[in-house]
Amino acid sequence: METYETSIGTQSYPPTLFPPPLGTGGFTTSGYIHALVDSTSNSNSNSNSNSNTNSNTNSNSDTKIPIVQISDDSHITHDSFKPYMEYHDASHLRNRNISKADQVDSTEVMEQFTQWSNYKMRSRSPTINAKPIRHTSQRRTDFTSKNELSKFSKNHNFIFHKGFLKRQHSIRREDRQAKVRSRFRSKKELTSVLNYIELEQMDIANVLASQSVNLHAIRNLTSRDPAVTPIPFLRSQMYATSSRPPYLRNRSIRRKLPKSQPGSLPTTTPATATKTIKQNSTTPTTRSVYNKNVGRSNTSPSVLYHPKRRGKLNTKSHARKEQLLLELWREYLMLVITQRTQLRLTLLCSPGSASNESSVCSSNASDLDMSLLSTPSSLFQMAGETKSNPIIIPDSQDDSILSSDPF
């Protein structure tokens, strides 16, 4: 049997079993368990072990088992725990401020500087919940008799109704606006021209007159519903001449055409293409996607292209894009307000300012604490102003420091 000394006496345990942790075996208290290990406790344990002659005194005196004290106090009064408690309180307060800053809505801070609620209400478009646009049906009376129809059908002729020519004109106009008019009628013509072009001898100024190229139109063509994305600029200096062989150069220029998706712009061959090119071309012809959803009568033109888009307004996509714009604008305004406030506090707490001797500025917090955003009034109290008279830094003036003393 092995003996272990605790604050309540000596307890014995079988050698095959491990003893419970010190200060926890058989105790059910609601207070704190403090293991105070110092020179006094070690000396007391050594004196108690030397007085006991029936047990192994030498082993107990060498191991220096600490004395466990159980206190029911709500706070720690020992001097050795003061640095730990100060660090624990500081970290707990910092974590609480950070969690509050994450949960606090920045609307109160925005209202102190701007009229965000009024702007948000005015920015809502009244046409979001409007009814879908309806096109009135233009019914035309067909005065063709049955005798005329039977006469022309025998000769395999077609009677053009009143709105046929107007509809064909609108189709050609929409087709010209939708597709990009190229100089080449097919891919073979483009490939044949590229085979005779030396990119190393070509002057880039003849192709790109400006210093930058706007890719906004290309992004709108590639995406069906373009979101709020920044417009990149492609510098003309990035087009460097390559020193690769011609066969590799021609292969790198070729690009695969994207697959046609329903709702996207169709890739139709122009009507001026010759018959020889159509016979020799090996690329499969893409069918037009407009014939699937177009529903019109035989005598009246209806919505020709994209009937779903023209017939009604997509309220969900419009609201989503508008919400994204509002969030981006709100984030930008919040960053500007925070930076201006931090700049003002830095100027007030600078060595050359008169408010440097205040208790708030004398602290070690150099950066703007996120907990200040939860209480907007504290921003003005730190700056020495009131809520009715906030600090305003106009954009026309310079934000530079007029003081001669450096930071």
From Swiss-Prot:
Compositionally biased spans, kind Low complexity: 40-61, 266-276
Compartments where located: Bud neck; Cytoplasm, Cell cortex
Annotated region (Disordered), positions in chain: 40-64, 251-315
Induction: Expression is regulated by the ACE2 and SWI5 transcription factors.
Keywords tagged on the record: Cytoplasm, Phosphoprotein
Record's GO cellular component terms: cell cortex; cellular bud neck
Bias-annotated ranges (Basic residues): 306-315
Motif SUMO-binding: positions: 391-398
In-chain residues carrying the UniProt-annotated modification Phosphoserine: S260, S264, S300, S302
Taxonomy, superkingdom: Eukaryota
Annotated Polar residues bias: 277-302
Primary localization: other
Subunit-level organization: Interacts with CBF2, GIS1, NAP1, PRM8, REI1, SHS1 and SMT3.
Role, per record: May be involved in a mitotic signaling network. Binds sumoylated proteins and may stabilize SUMO chains.
Official protein name in the record: Protein NIS1
Species of the source: Saccharomyces cerevisiae (strain YJM789)
